[in-house]
């Protein structure tokens, strides 16, 4: 009888009320009885096993919210600082500097460049051509006459000639330089022509000269022919040179 009454007493609504009264506000808590304490521990274990995922999720959510919120606030607060604003405006300035570096010829096309004392146009190596000086016939005659007298002019002479002809000293200097270069080319061409004519005259003289008389031929095969040729060659000079035998015969007679 007692065994059956204990489960009923456990399942009775009174014991359930005693258990739920433990979760009331702290000022209204009552001193628990031994029976209610046992029910409270069992209920806590049962409820903790079922409510553990919810507790973990709630704790994670509670931790995630404060962590995310100060991070956003820190970013928003730092965005108003001058350092962040300067960093945010840096890509625009970098792209502008890059566009200037990619197009370096924009400024060079508008200006002339002087390199090595030579005036260049657009920086592409094209020289600005000066206008060509046109000399009159009277000026050319006077310059040619002076060039026949001397090929090099001193500074006073050049200044005097330029003033008399209405030219600048630079124009007179350039004309004399060009005239000297042309004169040297003509001299070189004339020297080559003289050498060619001398060679032609030498060949003509060698062709008109008499033939050389044939001498002794060492390559002749017959001894008779060689003796005859030597005999014909030697007697022609015996009249000029006396033989050694005749000189030996004359010496005993004198003694």
UniProtKB/Swiss-Prot annotation:
Domain of life assignment: Eukaryota
InterPro entries attached to this UniProt entry: Distal-less_Homeobox_TF, HD, HD_metazoa, Homeobox_CS, Homeodomain-like_sf, HTH_motif
Tissue specificity as recorded in UniProt: Expressed in a restricted region of the developing brain, within the diencephalon and the adjacent telencephalic regions.
Biased composition (Basic and acidic residues): 100-112
Keyword terms of this UniProt record: Activator, Developmental protein, Differentiation, DNA-binding, Homeobox, Nucleus, Repressor, Transcription, Transcription regulation
Annotated GO biological process: cellular response to BMP stimulus; cellular response to transforming growth factor beta stimulus; cerebral cortex GABAergic interneuron differentiation; cerebral cortex GABAergic interneuron fate commitment; embryonic skeletal system development; forebrain neuron differentiation; GABAergic neuron differentiation; hippocampus development
The entry's DNA-binding region: 128-187
A cellular-component GO term for this protein: cytosol
Amino acid composition bias (Low complexity), ranges on this chain: 25-36, 217-232
Record CDD domains: homeodomain
Subcellular location per the Swiss-Prot or TrEMBL entry: Nucleus
Region (Disordered), start-end ranges: 1-38, 95-118, 204-233
The keyword Coiled coil belongs to this UniProt entry's keyword annotation: no
GO molecular function ontology, one term from the record: chromatin binding
Pfam families for the chain: Homeodomain (PF00046)
Stretches with biased composition (Polar residues): 1-14
UniProt note: domains: The homeobox DNA-binding domain is necessary for its nuclear localization, transcriptional and erythroid differentiation activities.
Assembly behavior: Interacts with SMAD4 (via homeobox DNA-binding domain). Interacts (via homeobox DNA-binding domain) with POU4F2; this interaction suppresses DLX1-mediated transcriptional activity in postnatal retina and enhances retinal ganglion cell (RGC) differentiation.
Family indicated by similarity: Belongs to the distal-less homeobox family.
Task of the protein: Plays a role as a transcriptional activator or repressor. Inhibits several cytokine signaling pathways, such as TGFB1, activin-A/INHBA and BMP4 by interfering with the transcriptional stimulatory activity of transcription factors, such as MSX2, FAST2, SMAD2 and SMAD3 during hematopoietic cell differentiation. Plays a role in terminal differentiation of interneurons, such as amacrine and bipolar cells in the developing retina. Likely to play a regulatory role in the development of the ventral forebrain.
Protein name (record): Homeobox protein DLX-1
Originating species: Mus musculus
